[in-house]
């Protein structure tokens, strides 16, 4: 095998209001209903894989952060795609917003890193995106962190989460129990006219 490279990016999310729904034992069905705003800024991840046994080294561009979440992302991916475990991974993380400030940066980082690793081995774009949201949701719930950030991020814009759970699940990753709707606004204005006096 040769060295493989992949990149993933995911914006952040600010929750405005929410209700918790964690009554199911199945992590895929846990989450929240609510509303929030998705941001363009978030996390960029660059993955480099080389022959190995599924080890991971995580480097952060600015600052020191806990890398265990990224190890959890890799573990979940190996369960989904065993071939990923045939590589040792280097993951470079670039954060454009602070952590632990309500921006959903753990969800953003989990989605971005999952995308980067899958893209490195050539997983098709849509499958990669859907699986990344599922993996991020499971990692977030196992770590008792985000409840609805991944579902919100799957919609984008100003979002409302109608049903709790992962936005994608199942063997075809075609839908989840989680449902969200995103609204994006585009403002188009006419050029200002200048008049000579």
Regions found by a protein language model. Give the residues of each.
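Single conserved hydrophobic/aromatic residue that forms the stacking wall/gate
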Residues: 186-197
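A short, sequence-level motif marking secondary-structure junctions
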Residues: 63, 166-167, 187-188
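Acidic/histidine-enriched ion/cofactor-binding microenvironments in catalytic or ligand-binding pockets
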Residues: 168-182
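Short capping/connector residues at structural and topological boundaries
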Residues: 19, 40-43, 108, 158, ...
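Conserved hydrophobic/aromatic beta-strand scaffold that supports enzyme active sites
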Residues: 7, 17, 44-46, 150, ...
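ATP-binding N-lobe of GHMP and related small-molecule kinases
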Residues: 1-100
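Charged catalytic carboxylate motif
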Residues: 69, 73, 112, 187
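Gly/Ser-rich oxyanion-binding loop with an adjacent helix/lid
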Residues: 84-170
């Amino acid at each position: 095998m040769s060295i493989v490279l992949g990149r993933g990016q995911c914006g952040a999310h600010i929750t405005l209001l929410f209700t918790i729904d964690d009554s199911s034992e199945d992590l895929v069905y846990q989450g929240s209903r609510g509303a929030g705003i998705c941001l363009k800024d978030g996390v960029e991840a660059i993955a480099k894989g080389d022959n190995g046994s599924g080890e991971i080294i995580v480097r952060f561009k600015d600052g020191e952060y806990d890398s265990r979440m990224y190890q959890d992302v890799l573990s979940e991916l190996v369960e989904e795609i065993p071939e990923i475990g045939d590589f040792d991974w280097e993951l470079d993380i670039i954060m454009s917003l602070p952590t632990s400030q309500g921006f959903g940066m753990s969800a953003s980082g989990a989605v971005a890193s999952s995308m980067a690793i899958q893209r490195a081995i050539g997983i098709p774009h849509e499958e990669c995106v859907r699986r990344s949201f599922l993996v991020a949701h499971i990692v977030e719930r196992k770590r008792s962190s985000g409840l609805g950030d991944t579902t919100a991020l799957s919609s984008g814009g100003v979002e409302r989460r109608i049903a709790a759970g992962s936005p994608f699940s199942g063997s075809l990753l075609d839908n989840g129990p989680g449902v969200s709707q995103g609204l994006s606004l585009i403002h188009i204005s006419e050029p200002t006219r200048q008049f000579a006096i």
